């Protein structure tokens, strides 16, 4: 694995039930490759890898990265 990707972690904490965390693949065709559903208070630590180029968060969650902290919102 490329060491460039190994330190790119994202912490996602659900603020309410039903937060979806979706991993998207690299390459010419972007596809879903993993999905998790979090309930209020649950935390997932995700990592960018040679296969994961993006992480989509759907729902109300606190997202922390090395670059800062943000909140996702419900529609």
From Swiss-Prot:
One Pfam family this sequence matches: TrpBP
Coiled coil: none
Protein name per the record: Transcription attenuation protein MtrB
Keyword Electron transport: no
Gene Ontology MF, one: RNA binding
Family indicated by similarity: Belongs to the MtrB family.
Role: Required for transcription attenuation control in the Trp operon. This trans-acting factor seems to recognize a 10 bases nucleotide sequence in the Trp leader transcript causing transcription termination. Binds the leader RNA only in presence of L-tryptophan.
Keywords associated with the record: RNA-binding, Transcription, Transcription regulation
Oligomeric form and interacting partners: Oligomer of 11 identical subunits arranged in doughnut-like structure.
GO biological-process terms attached to the record: DNA-templated transcription termination; regulation of DNA-templated transcription
